[in-house]
Amino acid sequence: VNQAFLISTGAVALAEIGDKTQLLSLVLAARYRKPVPIILGVLTATLINHAGAGALGAWLGSMLTPTIMRWALAASFIGMGLWILVPDKLDDEEANTNRTHFGVFGATVVTFFLAEMGDKTQIATVALAARFHDFFGVVAGTTLGMMIANVPAILLGDRFAHRLPTRLVHGIAAVMFVVLGAMALFGVGV
């Protein structure tokens, strides 16, 4: 296993803790109660999003000197660290997937892809691909990191949604999100 893959997996899995896409995974699971198409939708959206980000990063890496890339990577990691301190919020438009005609899988792909646009994990993917010059290792690693962070949220949302009213599950998810945001804000456990 190569360095680009391992670092990409770890960086994105950590960056996803408390992120709005993790909350989105929980909300989608609670709403639809169909974990398999949601997991496949998250995987598909992540592969598409991170492949584009990885391609941009690989191109930037070929255009810039190693010194500039080292500084850019350092700045992106410091920026991600600061970004984690700012709690994300799940916009109503991102969470509102009831009006779609694409089914659970399609709703998940579209919603998750849009939620990831400009997100810290997408920016990390660009920076990592530029630094390591390993498109496949970075995209595979960042995708695995996303799945490590989001599949448990989907399974948790699905499991408890059967026992609890959806409204209560959404409330619990909101509280979890606020707690994770506060932890990130104060640097406790994140």
Model regions and ranges:
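Hydrophobic/aromatic residues within the transmembrane alpha-helices of Major Facilitator Superfamily
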Residues: 13, 17, 47-48, 82, ...
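Selected transmembrane alpha-helices and immediately adjacent juxtamembrane segments
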Residues: 94-122, 128
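Hydrophobic alpha-helical transmembrane segments of multi-pass membrane transport proteins
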Residues: 144-153
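Juxtamembrane boundary at the C-terminal end of a transmembrane helix
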Residues: 182-190
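Short hydrophobic "helix-edge" motifs at membrane interfaces and signal-peptide entry regions
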Residues: 8-10, 106-110, 155
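Juxtamembrane transmembrane-helix termini in multi-pass membrane transport proteins
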Residues: 2-65, 124-144
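Membrane helix-loop-helix hairpins that form the core translocation module of multi-pass transporters
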Residues: 3, 33-97, 103, 152-163, ...
